[in-house]
């Protein structure tokens, strides 16, 4: 599973005659997604932020500047290769598959039936979770009709 670390730093600059140093506030919130297979995690914010934050006060800037730093640590999910050969995605994002029944015993099937079995058909919506689980990088539009 992937883990996500987030830190926000707010820096505000004040007028130099009123205050001698700029104000720096550090607010951090670290979110970890853990799983049973992963024993590694990010230890605090030391991997995200430098040890010392230096700021310079300017006389005409009194705005509050903030930025957010994201660090994404995780592993690639593996594609199930047998499923990758069986399923495709259309231009609209639908998952399609081949029809079964066209491998053998074709002599007793008429041409109309063989032609119908040659075409691709859509995967049922109830099977989308199974297919997407096997093919994590498939570009699927779940809202396509």
Curated annotation (Swiss-Prot):
Disruption phenotype: Embryonic lethality. Embryo development arrested at the globular stage. It is found in: Plastid, Chloroplast. Residues 1-56 form a transit peptide. GO terms for biological process: translation. GO terms for cellular component: chloroplast; ribonucleoprotein complex; ribosome. One of its GO terms (molecular function) is structural constituent of ribosome. Keywords: Chloroplast, Plastid, Ribonucleoprotein, Ribosomal protein, Transit peptide. Pfam families: Ribosomal_L35p. PANTHER family: 54S RIBOSOMAL PROTEIN BL35M, LARGE RIBOSOMAL SUBUNIT PROTEIN BL35M. Belongs to the bacterial ribosomal protein bL35 family. Part of the 50S ribosomal subunit. This is Large ribosomal subunit protein bL35c. It comes from Arabidopsis thaliana (Mouse-ear cress).
């Amino acid at each position: 599973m992937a883990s996500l670390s987030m830190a926000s730093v707010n820096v505000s600059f004040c007028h130099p005659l009123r205050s001698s140093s700029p104000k720096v506030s550090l607010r951090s919130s670290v979110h970890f997604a853990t799983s049973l297979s992963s024993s590694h995690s990010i230890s605090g914010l030391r991997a995200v932020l430098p040890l010392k934050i230096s700021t310079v006060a300017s006389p005409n800037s009194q705005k509050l500047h903030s930025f957010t730093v994201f660090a994404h640590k995780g592993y690639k999910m593996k594609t199930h290769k047998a499923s990758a050969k069986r399923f495709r995605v259309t231009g609209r994002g639908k998952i399609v598959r081949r029809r079964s029944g066209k491998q053998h015993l074709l002599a007793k099937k008429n041409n109309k039936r063989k032609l119908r079995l040659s075409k691709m058909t859509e995967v049922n919506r109830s099977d989308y979770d199974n297919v997407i689980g096997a093919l994590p990088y498939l570009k699927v539009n779940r809202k396509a009709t």
